[in-house]
Design a protein with these regions (language model features):
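Short linear sequence signals and composition-biased patches located at protein termini or domain-edge surfaces
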Residues: 4, 13, 50, 54, ...
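Hydrophobic/aromatic-lined pockets within catalytic cores
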Residues: 71, 75, 179-182
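A generic structural motif
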Residues: 162-163, 195-207, 211-213
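Short alpha-helix capping/helix-loop boundary micro-motifs
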Residues: 158-167, 341
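Aliphatic-rich helix starts adjacent to a transmembrane/signal segment
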Residues: 2-4, 12-67, 71-73, 387-388
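Ser/Thr/Gly-rich low-complexity blocks that favor extended beta-strand/coil architectures
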Residues: 166-196
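Structured core elements
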Residues: 141, 178, 187-189, 199, ...
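Helix-loop junctions and short alpha-helical segments
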Residues: 142-145, 149-157
Length: 388
């Protein structure tokens, strides 16, 4: 008779069941998903913080650099509201006219003399090309005569040179300069430099001069035939230059006085003349040189101005701050209580402060609404020479 035996049951099971494996995979997936979510959240937070920092950095740079030009606008080392005359042979170049050292332009108003630069990119002219001004955005023109403590030691009428008080003046052939005293200012291009002497002749630089600063008379109250800077009221008789050596001979109570005032008390300033280099700039919103990550071309805040290139004046453009979309400018007239748009200003010589409002965006799309971060920032700058 045949017998059968049942297989023995193992005391412990070996390996994993299918259910246990699926549970393990699910737990691992949950942990991995959580880690990825935390990483993604931190990454987005980092990108948002980085883009916000970039916006703040661009705003700081824009306001800092622009404020320097605004504060100095209209300044000269002599007297406020001086009549000035330019002898530049500039053919109407905007940087050769010092009559309106602060000038605003509305969104549809073109800046005179703005054109493409030598490389084919824009220099403030309205258009869609790189560096060209975005249509509908405002712009501003600023000029100042920056002093280096240079005074006139001698200026002989009938000559084309001015002797300075030092040979360490850092002026170069081609620089646009101003010579001024308490009555008159003259704008010219330096045609020659020899130690402590600078020339203002018709040659030696481009665009050059049409005459000499000895014949300035426009804007004065007596229209002298010749004008000698450094002499009282511009008057010189031979070697006699009143006010140059006698420090008691001072200017009158007003810049327009025809006669200097003798003051033995020393309470007034001696009649002296100064020389300063002129800096000019234009600020506007233009099409950026670089493209963003999504391939679009943004906008930037630009500064364009004349530079001395080996004796020839050329315009140079600088991209000051990227991702500046809009710029709104408002101007405060002397004695006024409200800021005015450029179209509401009747006399640019009366402007004492400028309010600048910039609209900036982030380089990347990091907003919760699927758009770029946007910030609007405002800054008010006072013109130093007109606030006193």
């Amino acid at each position: 008779m045949t017998s059968f035996s049942l297989p023995s049951v193992p005391r412990t099971l070996r390996g994993l069941s299918l259910i246990e494996l699926m549970i393990s995979l699910l737990l691992a997936l949950l942990v991995t998903g959580g880690a990825i979510a935390v990483f993604y959240s931190n990454s987005q937070t980092f990108r948002a913080t980085e883009n916000l920092s970039r916006v703040q950095e661009n705003a700081r740079a824009a306001f800092e650099i622009m404020s320097r030009d605004i504060r100095e606008a209209g300044g000269n080392p002599c007297e406020r509201d001086l009549p000035s005359e330019s002898i530049l042979n500039a053919g109407g170049a905007w940087w050769g006219d010092f009559d309106e050292p602060v000038r605003g332009f509305g969104g549809s108003e073109a800046m005179p003399g703005a054109a493409d630069l030598g490389d084919g990119t824009g220099g403030g002219n309205i258009g869609t090309g790189v560096g060209q001004r975005v249509t509908g955005t405002e712009a501003m023109q600023l000029q100042a005569a920056t002093s280096n403590n240079l005074t006139v030691a001698d200026h002989q009428p009938g000559t084309t040179s001015i002797t300075l008080n030092t040979a360490s003046h850092n002026l170069r052939v081609g620089d646009i300069a101003m010579v001024c005293d308490f009555r008159q200012a003259g704008i010219f291009q330096i045609s020659a430099v020899t130690t402590d002497t600078i020339g203002h002749g018709s040659g030696g630089a481009s665009p050059g001069n049409t005459g000499t600063v000895t014949n300035l008379g426009a804007g004065t109250d007596s229209t002298p035939v010749t004008y000698s800077f450094g002499c009282a009221s511009g008057s010189r008789t031979g070697t006699d230059c009143p006010g140059a050596d006698d420090k008691r001979l001072c200017r009158g109570s007003e810049p327009s006085d025809t006669e200097a005032t003798n003051a033995v008390s020393g309470s007034c300033r001696a009649w002296s003349a100064n020389v300063a280099r002129i800096t000019s700039s234009r600020w506007y919103i233009g099409n950026s040189t670089a493209r963003r990550g999504d391939g679009t071309r943004g906008r930037s805040l630009y500064r364009v101005g004349p530079v001395n290139n080996g004796g020839t004046i050329e315009q140079q453009r600088q991209e000051v701050a990227a991702d500046v979309e809009t710029m709104t400018l408002a101007y405060l007239p002397r004695g006024g209580t409200d800021y005015l748009a450029s179209g509401g200003v009747t006399d640019w010589d009366d402007i004492v402060a400028v309010r600048v409002t910039l609209g900036l965006v982030s380089p990347d799309v990091v907003g919760t609404d699927g758009a770029r971060l946007q910030r609007t920032m405002e800054h008010v700058v006072t013109l130093r020479n007109r606030a006193l």
